[in-house]
Amino acid sequence: SEPVVRMVLQEASDQPFVAQIAVAAVALDRVKDPRWPDTPKGVVYQSHQFTGMASKLRRYTHQQIQKARLAVWSAKVGIRPCGKGIYWYYSESIRAPSWTKRLSLRCVLGSQAFYADKQPQDVVEIFPIS
């Protein structure tokens, strides 16, 4: 899954290791969901999904590359720092994208916020008292 390793490097090389695992998990879990392409390469390079992938490839140290590979391996064996069903994230260093309003925030690791589909238990309804 070298495309996922590149994604972790481009999207989260400056983040804590646990956030790198969560970023890798997003890509790997999308492969299993019919809403996204069914290969890691297809997910990682899908248009308008991961802004870091549209950026020019930066230079990374051997240690950064090995750490990213370990993060991808950790996600492959099932480690999910934010739980299952996390398909979106963004860096909190930018303004929250509009798509976050329709999702449920599950966790924040480093400066990355991770989101899942809203579940019925996430919705709070307020009924007027008559």
Q: Could you tell me what each predicted segment is?
A:
Residues S1-S130:
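Bacterial extracytoplasmic/cell-wall-associated proteins, especially those involved in peptidoglycan
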